Amino acid sequence: MADVRPRVLAILPALFPSTIIGVAKPLLRLHHDRRIVLDLTLQYLTSRRAVARADVVVLCHTIDPQYGVILDWARELGRPIIYEIDDDLLAVPDDIPGLAYLAEPARQAQLVACLRQADIVRVYSPALREKLSAYSANVSVVSGPLDWSLMRTPALKRDGLVTIVYATGRTQDRVGAMLVAPLGRVLDRHPGVRLTVWGARHDALMSHPQVRSLPLVRDYDTFFERFSREGFDIGLAPLRDDEFHRGKSNNKFREYASCGIAGVYSDVCVYNTSVEHERTGLLVPNDDRSWESAISRVIADPELRRGIAERGRAYAREHFNEAVTDAAWMHAIESVDRPARPGRAPSSHSGSSPGELDKALGLARFLGKLAGQVTPVLREHGVRVVVQRTWQHVQGLGQFAAWLLKRRQLERRINARRSGGSGPVAEPGVSHRTSH
């Protein structure tokens, strides 16, 4: 019997939370459920043959200019592209450390080329859809993903303390700076409150006896399991109101609401298009006094906290789940004009993705290219530069090995869940907590 499932080639720039959560996990689930045949790979391992074998090409986030040939291959072979972008990469600010490479002219040009060529562009922000519609006629806003299997039941609280969390993936955190002064005043007035700052470090708060600092956890699954287990009462989500940040997703609302945490959010379009003020969260203007007042209010009113937590969690259950995420991906895949294909033999149903030979050949080409560069670089720049560049490439190979391991881990997790081996999903609702 012919295998008519669409073949999807998903090409990631690297493994980081948004590419794993938004692209890799849902597509691996669809592959395991036998709705698609997935080849999941990285940009520098992609070959023309892999593109030719696909019915649909999925790209996400940024496109390294040296791999822009992927767009050429897709165009020449008539392969449709679905492009997912969860940040406004056309408006990268110069005051956020580590993002300067995204603003390089060649990378910006590659981004625009991808937007113009893509058959479907997926975003998580209405503001970003409006902006990117200047480059593509088919930009859709989708609900953010959430992996409920990562939920853990928090321990019963008996100390009567109100716990607040501010969590961010930014170690150098300019956004959270707006909270430092109001939080300092709130903590001084409320000795029964404990604040956890997770991921960032704000020295003005770290010396306060009611503040706990936790380091950034780079593996998102590990982070979210620990986060859900903590049983925080109040979550803070500040956000700047500028062009770049208006393109963000409502990730903190998803995290806080799903964990039964009463969230306090900046009153900006990222949040006020999904958070209902005083029902599923509090929306706050970005000034010191407003933040101080809102945090104090939710500390002092346990009924408000409880109501926000319960309604927020119900909203998250309905709108942020695997069924919604996977259906949106399947709709996009089925909506594009795929090339006509002769009947194919059914693919083996296993966790492994097709195209392993192509990946091995891609790695071999990569290593061969490096070997050919050693002598010219040695002549022109000397031993020191050769050693530096060699070390960079060794690190790259380490990342490749880590990629293979992580992909297998994702596949095993999804296989176990689909086979019923992971046990029931924890339900850490507000009933696990004492009221304050």
Predicted features along the sequence, with ranges:
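C-terminal amphipathic helix plus adjacent low-complexity
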Residues: 317-318, 323-425, 429, 436
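Nucleotide-sugar-dependent
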Residues: 220-221, 225-258, 264-275
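N-terminal pre-catalytic "stem/leader" segment of glycosyltransferase-like enzymes
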Residues: 1-65
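A short, well-ordered alpha-helix in the C-terminal region of glycosyltransferases
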Residues: 297, 304-319, 331, 348
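Conserved acidic donor-binding segment of nucleotide-sugar-dependent glycosyltransferases
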Residues: 277-278, 282-289, 297-303
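Membrane-proximal helix-turn-helix segments that form the acceptor-binding/catalytic region
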Residues: 89, 101-120
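Conserved catalytic-core segment of nucleotide-activated headgroup transferases in glycan assembly
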Residues: 10, 14-32, 145-153, 157-230
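Donor nucleotide-sugar binding/catalytic pocket of nucleotide-sugar-dependent glycosyltransferases
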Residues: 116-152
